[in-house]
């Protein structure tokens, strides 16, 4: 069982624009043409921060619509937040706060032998790494640059560096890089 940060990034290392938009990403290809279907089939639990969850509410669930969307994950999802957020009917969403270590133990139990997916922004992922709980980073690098935005991971990883496990082409718009993460505390970059 591994804890994985699986995400898409611009070539210059941003996962979203400065205003948290992902609109740059959608024209680049169909999600089903990436490794996502195989990846999500191996996931047993998810974790995300409040900003990612709120993005999901606004862009996927759309609770104010006449026919709101459904939560896209069958797996239990832990949302790290310090404020009260609305739930989604029929979804196994668990709102938590505090250190990632105790929650990670709950996630491991729920995931059994399947992977834990750290969804969304790099700050929560950084907390998992700082606690020695991040095993892999899988980045689908898009063939665009944003110039500025939300960074892939707001941490310095230099000593020891990540270990490249694989690199592969995914259609004309993406390459996928898979890295193993060494168990060492990182320096924070602001």
Regions found by a protein language model. Give the residues of each.
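Enzymes that bind and transform nitrogen-containing heteroaromatic metabolites
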Residues: 1-190
